[in-house]
Amino acid sequence: MLKRASFVEVNTHSLRHNFNAVKNIVPKDACVMAVVKANAYGAGAIKASEIFLQEGANYLGVATLDEALELRSHFSQTPILILGYSPNTNASMLIDNDLSAMVFSLEQAEVFSQMALKSQKRLKVHLKIDTGMHRLGLEPTFKSIETIKKIRALKGLEVEGIFTHLSNADSNIKTHAKNQMKVFNAFLEQLLDQKIEFQYRHAYNSAGILSLCNGNENRLLNLYRPGIMLYGFYPSNEMKESSQTILKNVISLKARIVQIKRVKKGEFIGYGEHFYTNEETLVGVLALGYADGLVRALGNRIQVAINNQLAPLIGKVCMDQCFVKLNDIEAKEGDEVILFGDKSTKANDASEIATLLNTIPYETISTLSKRLERVYV
């Protein structure tokens, strides 16, 4: 029984299909880290992780300690890597919950080592290398090799992996991505020359998986990190047009009509004066708003699907509610409205919503609030 008249519908068959699409692309003996940060990009981290693990995921990737702890409470043995920054104050929680952390400096590693020794436990870490995104990471230099030697010598740490992140493998021109991999591979080879090896070596996100697995740039990799493609979206429109891989929509934002009102001509609907009734208007009120992840700016800009018909979203989206115009639409209170989802329903998909808002589908789906229940079908 749903507690609200709005929800996120998650297609579990599509989750399985998309994960297996990854498995069909990466090398047969490769490991896969399913990235389930931001509540699995809106799909619900626990259920999505359960499905990915059933389908053969070897590792789960998140961005924050809280996300990792939520997963650990359900998956006691599964390897979980926090891909984002972990403050030194989180060290004891990382150790006590057998979580893996990203490390990018000797100072950070020393703190983690000290805490691990106090706990008489070991903390697994993955070293982040900055090959050209210029976010977090050690520079791929001789000096960093010396730093890595010092980190590996610290007691209490298990330096399990090394990785980098590709910044624009989703573009048509792969020069920068290939240059990043050239730098990363050269650095790995320099480390190997000094007998420094890692259980896991990873770099490819969804864009890398979809576009760079046919060359030899990934020859030293053995772990792959799919994110957005698991949830049915290509990293860019360019990739959608060029990819041979079929991905299936996972997430639909839905609500039910909670009241239908007949509003006379000459009235304004909702806050401000953003929709004027130039005729008698049937207005359907939905219990869904921008606090749920339906962007306020979508008012008066999109059509939604009701009983296989298209109806305009009118007025400004409120924090908890919004309006649809039902003139010439067969609808009644309680009927389902699809704000975005599978194209077969006539609704926009999240990619089209993102284009309208001059953003990317990552943002459209990952900002869907946790106060919306997830319904798995």
Curated annotation (Swiss-Prot):
Substrate binds at residues 135, 319. The modification N6-(pyridoxal phosphate)lysine is found at residue 37. PANTHER family: ALANINE RACEMASE (PTHR30511), ALANINE RACEMASE, CATABOLIC-RELATED (PTHR30511:SF0). Its EC number is 5.1.1.1. Keywords: Isomerase, Pyridoxal phosphate. Its cofactor is pyridoxal 5'-phosphate. GO terms for cellular component: cytosol. Pfam families: Ala_racemase_C, Ala_racemase_N. The active site is at residues 37, 271. Transmembrane segments: none annotated. This is Alanine racemase. Catalyzes the interconversion of L-alanine and D-alanine. May also act on other amino acids. It catalyses: L-alanine = D-alanine. GO terms for biological process: D-alanine biosynthetic process. SMART domains: Ala_racemase_C. NCBIfam families: alr. Belongs to the alanine racemase family. One of its GO terms (molecular function) is alanine racemase activity. Pathway: Amino-acid biosynthesis; D-alanine biosynthesis; D-alanine from L-alanine: step 1/1. It comes from the Bacteria. It comes from Helicobacter pylori (strain J99 / ATCC 700824).
